[in-house]
Amino acid sequence: MSSLRRLLLLLLLVFPATLLLRVGPGGSLAVAQDLTEDEETVEDSIIEDEDDEAEVEEDEPTDLAEDKEEDDVSGEPEASPSADTTILFVKGEDFPANNIVKFLVGFTNKGTEDFIVESLDASFRYPQDYQFYIQNFTALPLNTVVPPQRQATFEYSFIPAEPMGGRPFGLVINLNYKDLNGNVFQDAVFNQTVTIIEREDGLDGETIFMYMFLAGLGLLVVVGLHQLLESRKRKRPIQKVEMGTSSQNDVDMSWIPQETLNQINKASPRRLPRKRAQKRSVGSDE
């Protein structure tokens, strides 16, 4: 029993000593080394982030420059400062659907070199987005040379589609020309939102069909009434009118007594006036 107690006391003394030796100065060094390694990794990550931000800041100006260059390359040609254009709509700025719209474009060369007017085109576009074409008309080839200090006039006409009536659209009219050096120019002579007017004059297909339908309906009504009247006339019974007897021979006189017949014959109106007339004539002679 005493030996067991001694062993337990020895273990109790040895075990804390071993723990102190393991976690002592060596353990603190390990923890310190771990902390320094973590700090180094954090500092390295911060430095890398700063380098990335610097690279992004350096790349931004180059990207903007590239975007500007792309815009310059992909952008449409502009008008030349040495040229001037005007437009005149022949029938005013009214655009009736399914009707001819005609306008004149004047070109003035104010420079010292010749300009070659190549073509004239027009198109209807979506009002909210002019990049979306609604109706694109055929370009008119011109190929006309305009000398310096000279003017030229060009005529163009188009027909708005009938379904576009009553709606607003963007009308774009472009005049394309170039100089002798090959520089291409484009002048937007007209670039505004216009409203297509619905045609009210004349007869369209729907109106003609409606009139024909009404005429046919009226004809059917007339024919029906005529047939109804004819059928009613046929159904009416013929009323018999009593005509009476035209002569006494048609009357059966056998049932009348003979004496009565003799009196009737004696007092007949045809014979009495004659007898009276004869008596009067005899009396006058006397």
Swiss-Prot record:
Specify the protein's topology with respect to the membrane.
Single-pass type I membrane protein
- The segments annotated as topological domain Cytoplasmic are 229-286
Glycosylation positions?
Answer: N136, N191
Which stretches of this protein does UniProt put in the Lumenal compartment?
A: 21-207
Q: What post-translational events are described?
A: Phosphorylated in its cytoplasmic tail.
Function in brief: TRAP proteins are part of a complex whose function is to bind calcium to the ER membrane and thereby regulate the retention of ER resident proteins. May be involved in the recycling of the translocation apparatus after completion of the translocation process or may function as a membrane-bound chaperone facilitating folding of translocated proteins.
Record comment regarding domains: Shows a remarkable charge distribution with the N-terminus being highly negatively charged, and the cytoplasmic C-terminus positively charged.
Protein name per its UniProtKB record: Translocon-associated protein subunit alpha
Q: Which organism is it from?
A: Bos taurus (Bovine)
Gene label: SSR1
